Structures are given as structure tokens and as C-alpha cells.
Amino acid sequence: MIRTIQTDEITKNIKEMCIQANHYLSADMDAAMKHAADTEQSELGKKILNQLQDNLKIADEEMIPICQDTGMAVIFLEVGQDVHFEGAAIEDAVNEGVRQGYTEGFLRKSVVGDPLIRENTKDNTPAVIHYSIVPGDQVKITMAPKGFGSENMSRVFMLKPADGIEGVKHAILTAVKDAGPNACPPMVVGVGIGGTFEKCALLAKQALTRPVDEHSDIPYVKDLEEEMLSKINQLGIGPGGLGGTTTALAVNINTYPTHIAGLPVAVNICCHVNRHVVRTL
């Protein structure tokens, strides 16, 4: 049976999600930060992690953004195939929600309308929107503001099949080493393996929206996540890039089938402010 959803409901929810995501970290991220502060072996690193916790508390109490870079709005829409939208075009409804959220929430406007001319759009639109059609009559919205200190440190590697899993490990470590302090560690590392050039990047982006206390349900991928987190934390980059045992809070890996001639790997890095909010309509 077809279910009708008014697109102004999409606008309303995305507006609220933009504000919420920029003011509060999810429970899994908050717990990971607390655990990192408890287990960090460097005194300076521990001090930095405690300061980051203080920052989160102040943002919560005073209703101000966790970070001055309130990001480019990345929206994932999982639309049930039995949903019919009425009202404005869905893309317009999404962008209107972002516009209202960033304007009424007094969030920094960080989007330029053209990558070469570079004039600010003054309302943080347009968003980057990813659609997928799924069974059912619901719409799942994931709103993830992505700051560019860490985004600029992200990489895509087009490996050869002969590079194998060791090549994948090397690519992940190379991306994190090159990022160093510029990605505002402790970081969350999203990895996409497989697909095509663009698919592996999308997999990596989606991996960042998975709770950091959840692993892949594929056993050997779960093992790889745990191994890479351990190796990354042995690099000594540490909180704020000033040394320590907490360079990353999590490594989340997504995989997809790929061509016999390729092994694409994308590493999408996020800082400790790994923001995302999920709602289902």
C-alpha cells in the first residue's frame, strides 16, 4: 500500500537534524571519547582529551556548536519504494531544511556555489544528497555535517588485485600518517573497499555513520577493523597530533563486489567531532 509523505516533513526534520548534529555528539561517540580519556597513556594526550570533553559539555549546556566548522551537509535518504512524496521536489525540500537549520541555528555557512569562483551561498546549501530505494513505506534520513579539515585528508587508492589485503592495510596507514595532526585527531576512519572509483568513496563515507561501538558483521572484515585500529594507535600521532596512544577511536570498513582487474580503496577520515543524526519517518 502506498504511503504519502508531505515533503515539508522532510524539510522540518532536516532543519532540526542540522541543529542537533552540530550541538551534540551521539552516545557512542561520547562513550568512545570518555574511554579514550581513561586509557590514554600520554599525560599531554589525556589533558587534550579532557579538554575536548569539556568542549562537548559546554556545547551541550550553552547550545553552541561543538566545532566552528559546522560542515557541509551530507544527507543520506533511504526511501521506501511504497512512499509517495507530495509537495516540493524532494531535493528542494532537503535543501530548504538545510537552509533553515543553518540560518536559524546560527551555524557557520561554509559552502561556495562554484568551486572555482568561490562565492559563499550564505545558507550552507546545496547539500550533498545520496538516495537509495529500499523496501517498505518509510524514509530513513541520515544527516552528517562534514568538516573539511579531515575531509581534505581523505584519499582514494586504485590498487591492483595483486596488492591484496597487505596493500589495503598499507593504504589505510598511509592515509592516516599523511593526515597526521591536520585531521584533528583522535579520528574516526571510514574505509570503503571494492566497487568502482566513486563507489568505494561512498562506502567510506557511509562507514563514518556507523556507530563506533559496532563492527562489521563479516568476521574477517571485523578482524581487519580491529587490526587497523591497533596499528593506527601505534603510530603515536595522538590527540591533537601532539603524541599519545589515541590516534583513532574507530576504524569502520564497508566492502562491495568489484571488477577482476581492480581493488579500489577509499579512506574517509573524520575528526573526533564525528557528527551524524538518524531519523525515520
Where do the model's predicted regions map?
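Non-transmembrane, aqueous-exposed alpha-helical and coiled segments at domain scale
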Residues: 1-281
